[in-house]
Amino acid sequence: MTAPASKLLQPITVGPLELKNRIMFPPLTTGYEERDGSIGERSLAFYERLARGGVSYIVIGDVAPVMTASPTPKLATDAQIPTFKALADAVHKHGAKVALQLFHPEYDVPGVGRMVMGSMAAAKAAQEAKAAGDEETFAAKMAESNEIRKRAYAKLHHDMQHFVNEASVEQLTQIEEAIAASAARAQQAGIDAIEVHGDRLVGSLCSAILNKRTDEYGGSFENRVRYALEVVAAIKEAAPELMVEYKLPVIMENPDGTPRGKGGLLPDEACEFAKLLEGAGIDMIQVAQANHTGNMGDTIPPMLPV
């Protein structure tokens, strides 16, 4: 066995965690969760197989602290804790550790959610009218449902571009509290670590390209990273037993000098921010390119042997 390979298999200590080797499974979404975001049998089988195969550290990607319409894991209510405990137990059985990557999407979740629920209610009323033979009400309710859904998609598209600048301080505080509450549930479930998703909303606030706010969360570098540091502090207070890491997205340059990615920090800023994260008690930093969807030309396609 070569020296690099033997190093890969050596144990390492990261914050409070003792990892049996340096083989990690990065955060990604599988779509294997239940409809409410809980961990079901398919998810359990997938992650336990990784742990049984020798992976020492598994990160569950895109875990939402609120009930969104997106098909991602969610740890937003106490009722979901037992399913995440089952996940932790399954992974621990093979000597591995498990982390949750907590994120909040870049849109007004309650606002979009109310519109989606309104569309579903109108569609249900339409089906009831059809069953009763009332074709006029059926047509009217279906038209209402479609119109509400259309407005929901329009709001979602708008928010993905503008929510970072339109969200009130009160909304940002509520999101921070939801993330902290989810971290506390993770600790209760026996999860080992939390990864702060530094892309998405948090990364958009850090970005000099996307963040146009004029309050305490916008403008200077110190203001733009303020929210990220507040989220880190809230997690560490809510779940003091857990290791905390940070996904740090970096905005790179294309050959023509244009930015590659928007939600994140420029390289020089990222270096300064890494020091602030260390001072805030972050145990590990995962560096990634900002907005990886802008990098698809350089991405290995799914299922391609390497």
Residue ranges: model-predicted function:
Residues 1-306:
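Flavin-dependent oxidoreductase catalytic cores
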